[in-house]
Amino acid sequence: MAKAAVRKPKKKVCVFCKDKVDYIDFKDTSLLRKYISDRGKIRARRVSGNCSQHQRDVATAVKNSREMALLPYTASAR
């Protein structure tokens, strides 16, 4: 049996770098919901495709948004 050709995964481009965003607002919950899982956890950098600086900014914005009760800390267990 021949091995299937292994494809290189396409590098994800940071959306914030591409759009030249300098500030991620914690009040923009529709944007931040893209970066949290259905269980309420912050998605990893390799999953979201953010650069390290913007991943830190997203994490800080999500944490601030949780503190202000705009986003949940966790989803309901069952």
UniProtKB/Swiss-Prot annotation:
Assigned keywords, A-Z? Ribonucleoprotein, Ribosomal protein, RNA-binding, rRNA-binding
Record keyword rRNA-binding present: yes
GO terms (molecular function) for this protein are: small ribosomal subunit rRNA binding; structural constituent of ribosome
List cellular component terms (GO): cytosolic small ribosomal subunit
Would I find Transport among this entry's keywords?
no
User: What GO biological process terms are annotated to this protein in UniProt?
Assistant: translation
User: What's one Pfam family here?
Assistant: Ribosomal_S18
Q: Tell me which InterPro entries the record gives.
A: Ribosomal_bS18, Ribosomal_bS18_CS, Ribosomal_bS18_sf
Role played: Binds as a heterodimer with protein bS6 to the central domain of the 16S rRNA, where it helps stabilize the platform of the 30S subunit.
UniProt subunit comment: Part of the 30S ribosomal subunit. Forms a tight heterodimer with protein bS6.
Which family does this protein fall into?
Belongs to the bacterial ribosomal protein bS18 family.
Instruction: List the protein's name.
Output: Small ribosomal subunit protein bS18
Species name for this entry?
Frankia casuarinae (strain DSM 45818 / CECT 9043 / HFP020203 / CcI3)
Q: What is the lineage of its organism?
A: Bacteria, Bacillati, Actinomycetota, Actinomycetes, Frankiales
Name of the gene this protein is made from: rpsR
